[in-house]
Design a protein with these regions (language model features):
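C-terminal regions of RecA-like/P-loop NTPase motor modules
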Residues: 1-4, 307-400
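P-loop NTPase motor domains
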Residues: 2-17, 24-26, 31-298, 314, ...
Length: 400
């Protein structure tokens, strides 16, 4: 690859440092972008993504509006390396049936995804403790390959007769056998289990039977290792999806990246992961994700609108893990946080003109005007459909 030199915009003040990231390693320190809607975040993200693609890097871009995905796709010359995922162009991402992972690793990944889904959509997120227990036992009990999917898991959580059938496939007297034998027996603890299972199933039922069905039923079709090794581009357009579907799909992909960082070896090629409106993938583990991904040559670029969207402790942990910060026009609270960092007044931040931003790369602060979008209007084209020769993966769990 030729020399890496990502310019973020035009220099507004000649006394400031040139707004350039001149080392690919600095991208693995991650980038945080904040600003009100319509101030230029999307244009900056599109510029950064296009640069990385032209540098032949593997890229994942998660876009809740879909417009940026379309503009980026339109600007890519070699579309053979692009996978465009949308409600009209689904790809199966089955966290219950992935090749090359131990069952405990799959359990961990899926529970992280459900944690975020339940936390963002439930008034009782504390129930996730019991949820972890139930999901872990369920995934470790499923033996038939055709049952390793969310559709069957949902039935298992809802119907006692399905649990009895599953118990019959287990070794009598084993811990898993005893767990399901006691699950539906009378008792306050068991009542809580059944109630929790039904709450989780209600969310999974919507996913496994609604608009997301084509994303979750079948053999897993997305391998992050393959995407990185082949330097492919994954554009994820979550527009036209309901909120739960958007949360679930975004987290499926982000926490697949976490599993890639933790368990896949070696990490030869870099991967850039862009998440616009990243509050829908935030969890207590997110700071760990940023810290671990750095050593795996994975750089995250996270954008959102205001602090109210993310719990304070998680936001603070994110600030401690990013090497580049970009602040467009923002509210008073956000301006108060960033003004001392950039060495300016709060009014300088919440009065920034459109497409202007303060940038901190390492320890250098710069006021910039971001580059104008190369494609202003959203292209009108038929959303690409993934071909049938998509590389399917195996469906074996590794014994432990």
């Amino acid at each position: 690859m030729s020399k890496y030199n990502l310019s973020l915009g035009y220099l507004d003040n000649l006394n400031h440092e040139i707004p350039e990231i001149t080392s690919l390693k600095d991208r693995f320190e991650h980038t945080y972008i904040i600003g009100k809607t319509g101030m230029g975040k999307s244009s900056l993200l599109e510029h950064m993504v296009s640069y990385d693609i032209n540098k032949d890097l593997a890229v994942i871009f998660i876009d809740p509006k879909g417009d940026s995905c379309k503009r980026i796709y339109q600007g890519i010359k070699d579309k053979s390396k692009v996978k465009y995922i949308s409600i009209a162009s689904p790809v199966v991402i089955n966290p219950l049936n992935k090749e090359g992972y131990k069952i405990d690793n799959l359990v961990q990944e899926f529970i992280q995804i459900l944690d975020v889904l339940v936390t963002l959509t439930s008034s009782n997120p504390e129930s996730t403790v019991l949820m972890r227990e139930i999901i872990s036992r369920a995934m470790k009990s499923i033996r038939k390959e055709q049952d390793k999917n969310i559709e069957y898991l949902t039935k298992l959580l809802i119907y006692p007769d399905e649990r009895q059938k599953l118990k019959g496939t287990l070794q009598k007297g084993s811990d898993l056998y005893k767990y399901w034998e006691e699950f539906d027996s009378k008792g306050n603890r068991n009542y809580q289990r059944v109630e929790c299972a039904q709450r989780v199933a209600s969310r999974l039922f919507e996913i496994s039977t609604g608009e997301m069905k084509d994303f979750v039923i079948g053999k897993n079709e997305l391998d992050i290792s393959e995407l990185v090794n082949k330097k492919q581009v994954l554009l994820v357009d979550t527009s036209r999806m309901n909120r739960n579907s958007r949360i679930y799909l975004s987290n499926l992909i982000v926490y697949s990246v976490l599993s890639y960082c933790e368990f896949a070896r070696p990490h030869k090629n870099p991967l850039m992961v862009y998440v616009d409106e990243f509050q829908i993938v935030v969890s207590r583990l997110f700071s760990d994700l940023l810290a671990r991904s750095r050593n795996s040559k994975v750089g995250f670029i996270l954008a959102h609108q205001n602090f109210q969207q993310i719990p304070r402790d998680i936001l603070g942990a994110i600030f401690g893990n990013v090497g580049t910060s970009v602040c467009f026009r923002c509210g008073d609270e956000e301006a108060s946080r960033f003004a001392p960092i950039f060495g300016v007044k709060t009014s300088d931040l919440f009065n920034l003109p459109k497409y202007f931003a303060w940038v901190r790369i390492g320890i250098n602060n710069t006021l910039i005007e971001t580059y104008p979008p190369k494609i202003k209007d959203v292209p009108d084209f038929e959303i690409p459909t993934l071909k049938s020769d998509f590389n399917f993966l195996g469906n074996q769990w590794i014994a432990i």
